[in-house]
Amino acid sequence: VQLAQKLGPLKHHCEQAVSRLIEVDQWLSIARWAHHDRCVMPEIVDHGVWLEEGRHVLLGLEPDPVTYGLGKAAIEGDQQSLALLTGANSGGKTTLLECLAHACILAHMGLPVPAKKARIGKVETLHILAKAGGTQSAGALEQTLVELAAVVSDPTPKLILADELEAITEPGAGARIIAGMLLAAEA
């Protein structure tokens, strides 16, 4: 009882010390991960996203680094705000989109990104539009267009990553429809 009476006034200080130690451990874990995965603090810019030797954080292997960017963050002469990625199946398109999304999310959390250099634009929202499970149907196309219309009509800064949307309708038609909507929204 006497020991409890002596230690009672220290309870609040002990709780604060444990809380601070947990926070230090959190930041040390982040630093250890960032060092191990060769991450850098990104430069925060007004618009776009650009990674030099960016790497996907969740592949579980040493990925091939990629240099890619969009918008004003990209290297000079390659600053378009809209890009259409094409290529063979298993060519890395989805992995690239995921890599850009991861970098954007990490940067907006104030964390380092797995890249040699990075410039990340300020965005209010990140939208990932991907093919829903199942086959192509008018309902899937209609639902995607309704979602996309809501996204592009919102004037806040955003990053939109769309993956395999052409699979929801005839080959090529979905990509043309969606690209047309994005270009109209950009105008």
Predicted regions located by residue number:
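Hydrophobic anchor at the beta1->P-loop junction of P-loop NTPases
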Residues: 85, 89
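Walker B catalytic acidic pair
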Residues: 162-165
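Post-Walker A helix-loop "phosphate-sensing" segment adjacent to the P-loop in P-loop NTPases
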Residues: 102-116
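Conserved lysine of the Walker
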Residues: 92-94
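Short glycine-rich substrate-engagement loop in P-loop NTPases that contacts/grips substrate
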Residues: 132-152
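Post-Walker A alpha-helix
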Residues: 96-98, 102
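Alpha-helical coupling/stalk and coiled-coil linker elements that connect catalytic or binding modules
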Residues: 1-84, 119
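Substrate-engagement module of ASCE P-loop NTPases
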Residues: 179-187
